Amino acid sequence: MQHDDRLIVALDFPTLEQAKACVVELGDAVSYYKVGMELYYAVGSEIIRFLKEQGKHVFLDLKLQDIPNTVAHALTVLSDLGADMMNVHAVGGKKMMAEAVKAVHEAAEAAGRPAPKLIAVTILTSMDNEQFADLNYKNTIA
């Protein structure tokens, strides 16, 4: 079965064993997996190593947000683990996002590999207009 890189399967499991079982069951049908906070915080980089050993792509969905220097250093470490795509939370600001981009590109260049994709989350999909208004933004969710 041929896989489609546009499909990213979320490994929203609390244990490494459950995540591995899902990857094994899906086999060659899926090549891209999302590792979120629950799994990454539970098992750390072991899940990334496993996925890379299986020849899979990794979207590390941690929505990093902190001072620019902290995010840049964290992304350098995560880039070196082999994540193919990562994200930051845009509310961290332009400077944080610019430092994030610079960090992943510098880490990739130093390691002689392509830079991972870096995307910014602007708003969580779970928010409604009432929750959005609580943040004191002037607009509504469109």
Regions found by a protein language model. Name each.
Residues 1-21, 109-115:
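N-terminal amphipathic alpha-helix/helix-capping segment at the start of soluble metabolic enzymes
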Residues 3-4, 70-142:
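Conserved anion-binding
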Residues 5-11, 33-35, 58-62, 86-88, ...:
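Hydrophobic faces of well-ordered beta-strands that scaffold small-molecule active sites
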Residues 29-42:
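N-terminal beta-alpha supersecondary unit
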Residues 34-37, 48-67:
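Active-site cofactor/substrate anionic-group-binding motifs, chiefly glycine-
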Residues 41-42, 67-70:
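Active-site beta->alpha loop and helix N-cap motifs at the rims of alpha/beta catalytic domains
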